[in-house]
């Protein structure tokens, strides 16, 4: 099945800004998140598709390659983005780990078949409010996992006994099969590649060396994390086979949409409504910040959509550095539910701005309509 265009997946145009791409990603990631659509394979597939598109289109080099060559740029080993959890975001090991690739579902890495396998890595999806993500927070979580059996101490053998070396493969976990002139290595059919045989298995774990348990963990989320960041808890994954090391637990962060602020990098954005009179005459308006309310001075003759930067009122990144800014967009609010007297006053005001005064009081409108008139005059001349 051919892949959909990444821009189509996110519902953005090809000239969309990084901010628009991130905004689309956050909206779709929340919609198709596995925690909100448990058991829905279609939603899980869409979540992976959205994440893959986001990872490509927010990386300048990958985006340039995709724009030029499409999906072909990442075929034949060109990135491995199909795994769904590779790339993107930041990892923080041991609580701030290294960037990892397609770890989930793997967990069995390194060594020969006869050696006990390291435990599988686990993933936990954690949803945070913007305030929690910005300030940092400690969260208690419950994780169903496999732990070493206390009764047999992870060996799988009944207490007082031990596993014996497999007589078929002599502990190698593999046997050599001859086919004509060729010798082929195959997994030992007796011990199934483990190299050991448990003749008297543990009554509790039935020879597995592990048992199911729900662990309660306290996770410290560092200040400044954002959607896509991952936190590694070393050794908190599934227990390994027959006493082998445990895997890791990766906590994947998703920040909920905020009703006031929108985050882009370390900057915050918000819209603040102002009255028509304040926009024209100037004044002060109260602006919300993560630290409380502050007053913003509004110059006279402010047009709707004008941006104001409040330095140091944004987010301090998880890796340190300067604190971001709060970008405030002023939106001039049209008055509604007017009384008769108010309507009369507005009509008087509008009439006072017409005629020769229009150029002075409404330069943009006057310039626009003069341009429209000239356009049609040129068409008919």
Curated annotation (Swiss-Prot):
Binding positions for Zn(2+) 2 per the UniProt entry: 166, 169, 188, 191
Gene3D superfamilies hit by this protein: DnaJ domain, Heat shock protein DnaJ, cysteine-rich domain, Urease metallochaperone UreE, N-terminal domain
InterPro entries: DnaJ (IPR012724), DnaJ_C (IPR002939), DnaJ_domain (IPR001623), DnaJ_domain_CS (IPR018253), HSP40/DnaJ_pept-bd (IPR008971), HSP_DnaJ_Cys-rich_dom (IPR001305), HSP_DnaJ_Cys-rich_dom_sf (IPR036410), J_dom_sf (IPR036869)
Superkingdom of origin: Bacteria
Keyword Cytoplasm: yes
PANTHER family: CHAPERONE PROTEIN DNAJ (PTHR43096:SF48), DNAJ HOMOLOG 1, MITOCHONDRIAL-RELATED (PTHR43096)
Function, in words: Participates actively in the response to hyperosmotic and heat shock by preventing the aggregation of stress-denatured proteins and by disaggregating proteins, also in an autonomous, DnaK-independent fashion. Unfolded proteins bind initially to DnaJ; upon interaction with the DnaJ-bound protein, DnaK hydrolyzes its bound ATP, resulting in the formation of a stable complex. GrpE releases ADP from DnaK; ATP binding to DnaK triggers the release of the substrate protein, thus completing the reaction cycle.
Cofactor, free-text remark: Binds 2 Zn(2+) ions per monomer.
Chain residues that bind Zn(2+) 1: 149, 152, 202, 205
Protein name, per record: Chaperone protein DnaJ
Zinc fingers typed CR-type, residue spans: 136-214
The record's note on its domains: The J domain is necessary and sufficient to stimulate DnaK ATPase activity. Zinc center 1 plays an important role in the autonomous, DnaK-independent chaperone activity of DnaJ. Zinc center 2 is essential for interaction with DnaK and for DnaJ activity.
Species of provenance: Vibrio vulnificus (strain YJ016)
The family this protein is said to belong to: Belongs to the DnaJ family.
């Amino acid at each position: 099945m051919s892949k959909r265009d990444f821009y189509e997946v996110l519902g953005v145009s090809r000239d969309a800004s990084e901010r628009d791409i991130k905004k689309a990603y956050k909206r779709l990631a929340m919609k198709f998140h596995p925690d909100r659509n448990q058991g829905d394979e279609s939603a899980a597939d869409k979540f992976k598709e959205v994440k893959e598109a986001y990872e490509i289109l927010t990386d300048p080099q990958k985006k340039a390659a995709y724009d030029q060559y499409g999906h072909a740029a990442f075929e034949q080993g060109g990135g491995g983005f199909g795994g769904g959890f590779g790339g993107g975001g930041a990892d923080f090991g041991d609580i701030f780990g290294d960037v990892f690739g397609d770890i989930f579902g793997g967990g069995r890495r390194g060594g020969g078949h006869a050696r006990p396998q390291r435990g599988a890595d686990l993933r936990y999806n954690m949803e945070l409010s913007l305030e929690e993500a910005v300030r940092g927070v400690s969260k208690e979580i419950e994780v169903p996992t496999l732990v070493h059996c206390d009764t047999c101490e992870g060996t799988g053998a009944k207490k007082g006994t031990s596993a014996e070396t497999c007589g078929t493969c002599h502990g190698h976990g593999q046997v050599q099969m001859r086919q004509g002139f060729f010798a082929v290595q195959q997994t030992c059919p007796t011990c199934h590649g483990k190299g050991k045989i448990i003749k008297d298995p543990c009554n509790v774990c039935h020879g597995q060396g592990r048992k199911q348990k729900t662990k309660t963990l306290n996770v410290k989320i560092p200040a400044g994390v954002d959607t896509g960041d991952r936190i590694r808890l070393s050794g908190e994954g599934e227990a390994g086979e027959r006493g082998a090391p445990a895997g890791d637990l990766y906590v994947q962060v998703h920040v909920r949409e905020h009703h006031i602020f929108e985050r882009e990098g370390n900057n915050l954005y918000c819209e603040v409504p102002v009255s028509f009179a304040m926009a024209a005459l100037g004044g002060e308006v109260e602006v919300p910040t993560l630290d409380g309310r502050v007053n913003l001075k509004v110059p006279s003759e402010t047009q709707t959509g004008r941006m104001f930067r409040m330095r140091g009122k944004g987010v301090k990144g998880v890796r340190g550095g300067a604190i971001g800014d709060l970008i405030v967009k002023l939106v001039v609010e049209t008055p509604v539910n007017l009384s008769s007297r108010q309507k009369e006053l507005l009509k008087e005001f509008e009439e006072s701005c017409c005629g020769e005064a229009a150029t002075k009081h409404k330069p943009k409108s006057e310039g626009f309509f003069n341009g429209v008139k000239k356009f049609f005059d040129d068409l008919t001349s």
